Amino acid sequence: MSRISIEQVKHVAHLARLAITDEEAEMFTKQLDAIITFAEQLNELDTENVPPTSHVLDMKNVMREDVPTPGLPLEEVLKNAPDHQDGQFRVPAILE
């Protein structure tokens, strides 16, 4: 028995503003049913002694100390700029 109906697929497609044909709705129904069946297999797993986790991997942020360093020289920064004036990038005006 299918766990999702063609009407449900058409309804979700309508909510998503997707125009699908009857053939596409039938194809998506079969695909979604297979996905749901596969996902339901997870209910068969014994998770009794498995602690809840928020991440599968034990991840930690490894931070380094901020060390101030000199920036690039102004000439180096502006050398690839298409246009500059008074040590600043010059860009076309966007407001009138």
Swiss-Prot record:
Gene3D superfamilies assigned to the protein according to its UniProt record, in alphabetical order: Glu-tRNAGln amidotransferase C subunit, N-terminal domain
Coiled coil segments of this chain: none
Keywords: ATP-binding, Ligase, Nucleotide-binding, Protein biosynthesis
Entry's EC annotation: 6.3.5.-
First-tier enzyme category under EC: ligase
InterPro entries: Asp/Glu-ADT_sf_sub_c (IPR036113), GatC (IPR003837)
Pfam families for the chain: GatC
Highest taxon, organism lineage: Bacteria
An example Gene Ontology molecular-function term: asparaginyl-tRNA synthase (glutamine-hydrolyzing) activity
Record field: catalytic activity: L-glutamyl-tRNA(Gln) + L-glutamine + ATP + H2O = L-glutaminyl-tRNA(Gln) + L-glutamate + ADP + phosphate + H(+); L-aspartyl-tRNA(Asn) + L-glutamine + ATP + H2O = L-asparaginyl-tRNA(Asn) + L-glutamate + ADP + phosphate + 2 H(+)
GO BP: glutaminyl-tRNAGln biosynthesis via transamidation; regulation of translational fidelity; translation
Subunit structure: Heterotrimer of A, B and C subunits.
UniProt family annotation: Belongs to the GatC family.
NCBIfam families with a match to the protein in the record: gatC
Matches recorded under PANTHER family: GLUTAMYL-TRNA(GLN) AMIDOTRANSFERASE SUBUNIT C, MITOCHONDRIAL (PTHR15004:SF0)
Protein's job: Allows the formation of correctly charged Asn-tRNA(Asn) or Gln-tRNA(Gln) through the transamidation of misacylated Asp-tRNA(Asn) or Glu-tRNA(Gln) in organisms which lack either or both of asparaginyl-tRNA or glutaminyl-tRNA synthetases. The reaction takes place in the presence of glutamine and ATP through an activated phospho-Asp-tRNA(Asn) or phospho-Glu-tRNA(Gln).
The protein, known as: Aspartyl/glutamyl-tRNA(Asn/Gln) amidotransferase subunit C
